[in-house]
């Protein structure tokens, strides 16, 4: 009988040791998963903030101003050193620096010039085609 008790205690000690090792491995794995998810959520938030800042950079119309998005708001200032954008979300605030941007009004003027030039070319072609038709008749 004395030997049977030792065997039972040995099996119980082995089972507790294996359970403790499994528990430690499970805890390590779960901590890795939680850290991975937190890192993913932070990177996603930074990416969304950068996308808002980039969109604001493309739509700059004044020297400074604000734009509002569903996920936050962006304030910007166009300085000599560059375009400073501050993105405020529900959870945090980010700041991005871009090269200085020309104001959009200048871009519009260029587009108008191009449109005017192309319409003038079309008018010239039409006026050149009319005399040719008269000569053929």
UniProtKB/Swiss-Prot annotation:
Task: Give positions of region: Disordered.
Answer: 106-137
Describe its membrane topology. Single-pass membrane protein
Question: Which GO biological process categories is it annotated with?
Answer: establishment of competence for transformation
**Loss of function: phenotype:** Prevents transformation pilus formation and transformation. Reduces level, but not processing, of ComGC. Reduces level of ComGD and abolishes detection of ComGF.
An annotated GO cellular component of this protein is: plasma membrane
Membrane spanning stretches: 10-30
Q: Show the InterPro entries listed in the entry.
A: ComGG_streptococcus-type
Which compartments does it reside in? Answer: Fimbrium; Cell membrane
Please provide the record's keywords in A-Z order.
Cell membrane, Competence, Fimbrium, Membrane, Transmembrane, Transmembrane helix
> Could you name the domain of life of the organism this protein comes from?
Bacteria
Q: What does this protein do?
A: Required for formation of the type IV-like pilus (T4P) that plays a role in transformation. Transformation pili are dynamically extended and retracted, perhaps thereby promoting DNA uptake and transformation. Required for transformation.
Question: Subunit arrangement?
Answer: The transformation pili are flexible filaments, consisting mainly of the major pilin ComGC and smaller amounts of the minor pilins, including at least ComGD, ComGF and ComGG, and perhaps ComGE. Interacts with ComGC; the interaction is probably direct. Interacts with ComGD. Interacts with ComGE. Interacts with ComGF. May act as a link between ComGC, ComGD and ComGF.
Instruction: Name it.
Output: Competence protein ComGG
| Provenance organism | Streptococcus pneumoniae (strain ATCC BAA-255 / R6)
| Annotated gene | comGG
